[in-house]
Amino acid sequence: MAADRPLVEVDGLTFRYRRATEPAIRDVSLTISPGEVVLVAGPSGCGKSTLIRALNGLIPHSYRGDLSGEVRLRGRTVAGMPLRETSLIVGTVLQDPARQIVGATVETELAFGPENLGLPREVIRDRIRRVATRARIEHLIGRETSELSGGERQLLAMAGILMMEPQIFVVDEPLANLDPATAATLLVMLRELADDGHAVVLVEHRVEEALELEPDRVLYLEAGAPRYLGPVGGFLRVADPTSVKLPFEAILARARAGEVPPDEWSPPPPRTDPAAVDSAARLTYLDVHAGYGEREVLHGVSATLQPAETVAVLGPNGSGKTTLFKAAMRLIEPTSGSVSVDGAPTENRTVADLARVFGYVFQSPSQMLFARTVREELTYGPRNLGIDPADHAELIADSLGRVGLADEENILERAPQTLSFGQQKRLAIAIALALRPQTLILDEPSAGQDHRSAKGFMRSVRTIPGLESIYFVTHDVDLALTHADRILLFRDGRIVADGPPRLVLEDEDRWIQCNLRPTSLMRANAQRGAPGSRFLAAESLARRLARSEPLTEMEGSDGRDR
């Protein structure tokens, strides 16, 4: 740590938003010096986003409420600095990159900030070349931002901040949008920035991956208050393993100490008997080619997805995972080949008609939310599909309950734009559930969610009456392995593997070629699990190993302790 004076000083920070009854964050104190990396972790709603807003000046300049304590940057109070000046010191990468990108092309996006500073064109061009190399996005130069995948947008958002050359980098939940190999590359980049003398604040739910950054300290928040601030080792001993995704060996150590509670979720009932469902496949792709403009993304994809299946789609950023389901919803049209739903070609069906079959949740919730209140968002779809208004209240209550939003203060009258990214993501899922679809399609369902929330709604939706199948795109390997019956593995617009999780994992070279990396839970299941058995959730596997119970095929993907 190169300098005597900290870059960041937080002294007794407490903040309560207007109309809220309780503070979002309470009595947080923290200093960050040049060259230091601080990981901020904690359950959803613990105050992480509020802390970010206080660091970058959005509190108190844009978010009003009751503020006490102080935040100082290079010795100056944030409250006394204009936002323009704060933004030159603190660069923030948002959870949802779609809300951060304003340029039509990658080059114009990278140039946007420096142009607003009045930098000469040649300086900007040189900086674009250097930043594109450092951010590993040279291959994106020349592309339109509207055609980028979610992970590619995440890297572009990071590059846009690099263009501004701030002293402090605040990065909010970047890993959910990135495949594991690209996520590791981003973490290396952040460590390089710290080694160059920058301060780095990483807010992340996926703690196991974030620890590869080797943070100097961890700030762990619970219910808005600091529970722990110190080295990684102490954090692993105090963090709630049911809310924070810890390395498996840390969970096992906690289980041996009796600190991992039994799984509180009841196992879902068996999926609908495939024989009882219409024999036609839910989705059939036959030699599908599709893309955006002149750029083809899917190259001759053929696959059949059945009702009564839970299917996870994994693969590198930009490999065609999202495009696969956009083609099913007619959000894009194949250039050749065909897509059929329940045996009928999609070209003969309208998007509204397909909405009666599929509940589709975009990767970015901002693409789905437009109404003034949460209540209006939830009633819009049922009203347009002709669902009896007398049933709306029950649909709304059930949908909010399944995604863990029912108990949020005054939730129905809140504006969706005031919700956190994680809450917006859960609201988007609730909107899809309110349509009572036959099949739920989720793009990155765990983005912005803590471990408990992601596991909870993935289990809860399986019990919805009439819901036959769940198809989800994810970079969360553990989520796929513990919840899916089947995995489709994508690479370069083609399916390179298709089968049950354990069979797909057998070819480790192919796994690595698809930018996937073994997790500690994956290795523990593979080493200790019974051959052919389902993957167990981390807490369940840890409790069994702690009790020295034999591992047999005793349970499904719910992972509940018996």
Place the predicted regions along the sequence by residue.
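Conserved beta-strand-loop-alpha-helix hinge in the C-terminal portion
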Residues: 225-247, 494-521
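Conserved ABC transporter NBD signature motif
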Residues: 64-76, 337-345, 354
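The feature captures the beta-strand-to-loop junction immediately N-terminal to the Walker
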Residues: 41-43, 314-316
